[in-house]
């Protein structure tokens, strides 16, 4: 499906983006250069994943930067576990634990339909997974819970079209500007 496996977390992280919903400012760390044309975006480009992750965790560990709440679609079972595992693999456990203001990052196994999933509790940071919230608080089952499908049903919007690229890898290697 184009997404790297969470358990092995074998693929490099290419981008990390965070939006402050109070200021609307977006901060992005990327594995490559980007021609930023938006006033509300701060983009930092890096040559290696190590540099990207180190810059990110150094920013995150500053008390005023560590969010009280993080949100995302399927972030509990994908984004956060993948990020935590890559931080641990590339920077080591000590820096990975800085995701928590208290140094408390705990792995959990969650079984859904008999399939093992990995999740992490980050002490001091509340995680709100929009996929879980959507399933819990909407009373109509959907044929799919892919973000693109739900955005279409609920907002009449689609994710960014990248059909001009044959593969997802082509998208981020040949269309970096659009990918970011």
Predicted regions and their residues:
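Active-site-adjacent structural elements in folded domains
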Residues: 2-3, 52, 173
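C-terminal or mid-to-C-terminal helical accessory/interaction module adjacent to the motor/catalytic core
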Residues: 137, 142-143, 147-179
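Conserved DEDDh/DEDDy metal-dependent 3′-5′ exonuclease domain
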Residues: 32-141
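Residue-level signal for well-ordered alpha-helical scaffold segments within enzymatic catalytic domains
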Residues: 1, 17, 55-59, 82-85, ...
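Short acidic-glycine loop/turn motifs at beta-strand connectors
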Residues: 20-24
